[in-house]
Amino acid sequence: MKNLNLVALPHFVSVENLKNDEVKALIKRAEYFKKGGAVARLTSPVYVTNMFFEDSSRTHTSFEMAERKLGLTVIPFDPAHSSVNKGETLYDTSLVMNALGIDLEVIRHSQNEYYEDLINLKQHQKLNIGVINAGDGSGQHPSQCMLDMMTIHEHFGHFKGLKVAIVGDITNSRVAKSDMELLTKLGAEVYFSGPECWYSEEFDQYGKHEELDKLIPKMDVMMLLRVQHERHSGDPNEKKFDAHRYHEKYGINHKRYEAMKKDAIIMHPGPINHNVELSGDLVESDKCMFVRQMENGVFMRMAMLEAVLRGRKLGGLE
């Protein structure tokens, strides 16, 4: 019998269409795993491959750990030695993986919404593979977003009315876009700060842009973003970038740390540039959730992967 309290999805590529009760159910499931709850027993093998076309330490390793904890069979994939370098398209690569027996593929790619070509059932008849988005260009990062929601919920127990500031290179951050969308949906109040050259008016629908020092005393969550230098090709502001000046204007130093609310927290998706977004000796401070976010990432990705297993009825799960 299908468990109505568990989420079932054919793919996990965005947070856009997630219902609030699905978000909360995924958080609850991830918390269950974190407490040592037993994973569902697979009655048949499930094969997954991690296709990372952009650099990754946390997300790649976290997904593989989650996959192994769930009992999935992980098949290695190295983009540097794949036929992509011979001109093979991502779609054709996925078609090959599917034909070889791969059930799920976790993909990180520089192209925004790369997944649309892989999940469009009307367009393709022979590709039938589950897709989990591990980050698409500057578009979405659903797994980071979900582990962020888990971390916030774990600390505060709710979302409604929480004040969250997203600070940094917002335009180029897929984490920011996923988080602002879901936080707003869950009832949090979103604010922005950082260089105006890396902020777009399209974000005004989620919150307002303010000076950092005015925001800090009011915020429950300070969500810091690194400057996405790799996405600044042709951006004249990149040549003017000065790490020391950035830290002085937009970074969390000891003075700003002390100005935060007693129960407020600092979050960062990583990698952290020490003494740019955050003073290096504050990375492991009491308010900083960086390590906890990484820890929670494994359990949330277990919940997300399990949701797709159920949605596709893989391994005997429904």
UniProtKB/Swiss-Prot annotation:
Q: What is its EC number?
A: 2.1.3.2
Top-level taxon of origin: Bacteria
Matching entries from Pfam families are given as: OTCace, OTCace_N
Q: What pathway is this protein a component of?
A: Pyrimidine metabolism; UMP biosynthesis via de novo pathway; (S)-dihydroorotate from bicarbonate: step 2/3
Catalytic activity entry: carbamoyl phosphate + L-aspartate = N-carbamoyl-L-aspartate + phosphate + H(+)
From the Swiss-Prot or TrEMBL record, what is one GO molecular function term? amino acid binding
Entry keyword annotation includes Zinc: no
Could you tell me which SUPFAM superfamilies the record lists for this protein?
Aspartate/ornithine carbamoyltransferase
Q: Which residues bind L-aspartate?
A: K86, R174, R226
Binding of carbamoyl phosphate, residues: R58, T59, R108, H141, Q144, G270, P271
Gene3D superfamilies xrefs:
Aspartate/ornithine carbamoyltransferase (3.40.50.1370)
**Signal peptide bounds:** none
Keyword terms, alphabetized: Pyrimidine biosynthesis, Transferase
Instruction: Write down the InterPro entries for this protein, in alphabetical order.
Output: Asp/Orn_carbamoyltranf_P-bd, Asp/Orn_carbamoylTrfase, Asp/Orn_carbamoylTrfase_sf, Asp_carbamoyltransf, Asp_carbamoyltransf_Asp/Orn-bd
Look up the record and give one Gene Ontology term from the biological process aspect.
Answer: 'de novo' UMP biosynthetic process
One of the record's GO cellular component terms? cytosol
Q: How does it assemble?
A: Heterododecamer (2C3:3R2) of six catalytic PyrB chains organized as two trimers (C3), and six regulatory PyrI chains organized as three dimers (R2).
User: Which NCBIfam families does the protein's record reference?
Assistant: asp_carb_tr, PRK00856.1
Record PANTHER family: ASPARTATE CARBAMOYLTRANSFERASE, ORNITHINE CARBAMOYLTRANSFERASE, MITOCHONDRIAL
Give the protein's function.
Answer: Catalyzes the condensation of carbamoyl phosphate and aspartate to form carbamoyl aspartate and inorganic phosphate, the committed step in the de novo pyrimidine nucleotide biosynthesis pathway.
Family, as annotated: Belongs to the aspartate/ornithine carbamoyltransferase superfamily. ATCase family.
Official protein name in the record: Aspartate carbamoyltransferase catalytic subunit
The record lists the organism as: Lactobacillus delbrueckii subsp. bulgaricus (strain ATCC 11842 / DSM 20081 / BCRC 10696 / JCM 1002 / NBRC 13953 / NCIMB 11778 / NCTC 12712 / WDCM 00102 / Lb 14)
Q: Which gene encodes it?
A: pyrB
